[in-house]
Amino acid sequence: MNLAGMIDHTALKAETSRAQIETLCKEALEYKFASVCVNPTNVALAAELLKSDDAVKVCTVIGFPLGANTPEVKAFETQDAIKNGATEIDMVLNIGALKDGDLSLVERDIRAVVEAANGTLVKVIFENCLLTKEEIKTAAELSVKAGADFVKTSTGFSTGGATVEDIRLMRETVGPDIGVKASGGVRDFEGAKAMIDAGATRIGASAGIAIVTGGTSDSDY
């Protein structure tokens, strides 16, 4: 198992500095992580720093962290991020619409990003800690229907992160051909392995180095 190649090495806090992005990218190249996951304002810098190695992708977040932008705004964010060098897109779905049962809006929201991405890989963030199990299942079904490539547990900025139980449910719902990303609270090798054993194919974490070296981090993301 190439664990490093399953990790999105992440720095999404509001106070993230240029120096921290430089360190993040240097570490991603050294450990050969799947991607760096950064806020849209840092995409161009990350793309420049990683241009020597196409294997490390530049992932960014859309409608983050609330998911409460309109589909049109999320589509523009997506196009702008790709123009700036993003090669993977993690979007937050419309959580309020899902809770309201407005499933047509949820699907349209996801589809708007998928279409704007135009072939660039799209992951859909659910924020499972705010959802019932049935809502998680519905979100997964709508993500597949709208053409997303991955489903993802959490932003890391709400009341809870990834759980083994939720990863199993998401994997069972989407089947074998869609990626499942565990994010939020994965801090060490044991935690990452538990998520992978449950069906995760990607781990989002700021604790990537601790995970691959057998250490432990106190990071919430």
Swiss-Prot record:
Subcellular localization is given as: Cytoplasm
Enzymatic reactions = 2-deoxy-D-ribose 5-phosphate = D-glyceraldehyde 3-phosphate + acetaldehyde
Q: Which UniProt keywords apply?
A: Cytoplasm, Lyase, Schiff base
**What SMART domains does UniProt report for this protein, alphabetically?**
DeoC (SM01133)
In what pathway does it function? Carbohydrate degradation; 2-deoxy-D-ribose 1-phosphate degradation; D-glyceraldehyde 3-phosphate and acetaldehyde from 2-deoxy-alpha-D-ribose 1-phosphate: step 2/2
**Recorded superkingdom:** Bacteria
> InterPro entries, alphabetically?
Aldolase_TIM (IPR013785), DeoC (IPR011343), DeoC/FbaB/LacD_aldolase (IPR002915), DeoC_typeI (IPR028581)
Q: Does the keyword Transcription regulation apply?
A: no
Offer one example of a GO biological process linked to this entry: deoxyribonucleotide catabolic process
Keyword Cytoplasm on entry? yes
Q: What are the positions of the active site?
A: D90, K152, K181
Q: Which Enzyme Commission number(s) are listed?
A: 4.1.2.4
One annotated GO molecular function is:
deoxyribose-phosphate aldolase activity
What is the predominant subcellular site recorded for this chain? cytoplasm
Q: List the disulfide bonds.
A: none
GO cellular component terms, A-Z: cytoplasm
The record describes the protein's role as: Catalyzes a reversible aldol reaction between acetaldehyde and D-glyceraldehyde 3-phosphate to generate 2-deoxy-D-ribose 5-phosphate.
Q: What is this protein called?
A: Deoxyribose-phosphate aldolase
Q: Which gene encodes it?
A: deoC
